[in-house]
Amino acid sequence: EWYELRKGMLTASSLACALGDDHFKSRDQLILEKVENKEIPFVPNPITEWGVKYEEIATKFYESLNNVKIIEFGLIPHPNFTIFGASPDGICSNDSPNEYVGRMLEIKCPPKRKFTKTCPPHYLMQVQGQLEVCDLDHCDFFQVKIEDYENFEEYEKDLFLDDDVILPGR
């Protein structure tokens, strides 16, 4: 159903592609998909599967860290331009502290990309589009690095030094 709603609609997550800044799809391919109303189904890859696997954990972590409740909305059409829409990862509910009410959340859980203090440009376009669709002013771009361990011993090796002291930042 989500894919059906997106057909023919430009979404915030497609803005970078529409502006020619996508590593996986050309602007021409996007235009062709939208004009023909035949969006090619997204084929998951290891990076997107990783993000989907850990997005709920990252949301819970954000909620705990900021003492908020996140509500998911699915695909939201722009109130004035129905051919444009967005699917933010969540918005802080009215049950959240005042400074967080209505704050949007966009989560990324990249398995390998190195984090910087700034939002990568292609994600910034997505966030700006989401804010416009939802008529909001603030978004937390929340990047989470989650380690996946094969076994408990591997986890312990990462957590402790040889003398059983917990490493800083763990």
Where are these regions (language model features)?
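Charged, glycine-rich intrinsically disordered N-terminal tails and low-complexity linkers that flank
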Residues: 1-53, 57, 148-150, 163-170
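Residue-identity detector for threonine
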Residues: 11, 48, 59, 82, ...
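Short, well-ordered alpha-helical scaffold segments within catalytic/effector domains
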Residues: 55-59, 124-127
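Active-site region of the double-stranded beta-helix
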Residues: 62
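Nucleic-acid nuclease catalytic cores
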Residues: 65-88, 92-170
